[in-house]
């Protein structure tokens, strides 16, 4: 699989707690995502806020085993990222990806105690199988996602919980693409329901102007879409 460009948005990690959770005992419990990248992001956020210190050199592959100092005696509960909001009632705090927080009816901006900086480089990308990155279908999808219409939707819909990272949004179309040849075709793309499928729905409207159908397939995990792209079952 090949990364094409860091498009569209950054899903921010937020540290949240349930109202009424005191964490007043000898230790507190924090739920964190258990996949490699998001667990490291959670730990780096906690380090940035002064709750823990990681071993020297621990970065995007950090796990709880890389914690060097834990002065608040935090106990960590490692949970599949999509399930972190569901265990919030059982822990004192949780570090949640903003897309999953939004799906759980949480507001990452208003409800969080801390958030990743808006300049976080963990941007979501459009990924296709190596060799397909310069096809007209992929370029058409890329142009639609990098449009001003999509950027405006992200700003208005998510109010800072999700951030567009497109530097110069366009009109949604790529002059190098033969849209007449693409008319009547279908582009398939896998995405999580919130916010990715919602954002893709805006791109779908843009592509429909050229009689191109965008088939959005929703998944709740990160792994299966990657496998489907690699196998060629979906386009992106």
Question: How should these model regions be labeled?
Answer:
Residues 16-20:
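C-terminal motif of bacterial Sec signal peptides marking the signal peptidase cleavage site
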Residues 26-31, 182-194, 212-218:
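Short, well-ordered beta-strand elements
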Residues 28, 51, 72-75, 89-96, ...:
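Alpha-to-beta junction loops
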Residues 40-43, 47, 137, 145-166:
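Periplasmic-binding protein-like
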Residues 44-51, 57-65, 193-215, 224:
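Short, polar/charged alpha-helical segment
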Residues 58-86, 216-227:
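Short helix-initiation/N-cap motifs at beta->coil->alpha
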Residues 63, 77, 105-119:
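Short beta-strand->loop
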Residues 122-140:
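A bilobed periplasmic-binding-protein/Venus flytrap-type ligand-binding module shared by bacterial periplasmic
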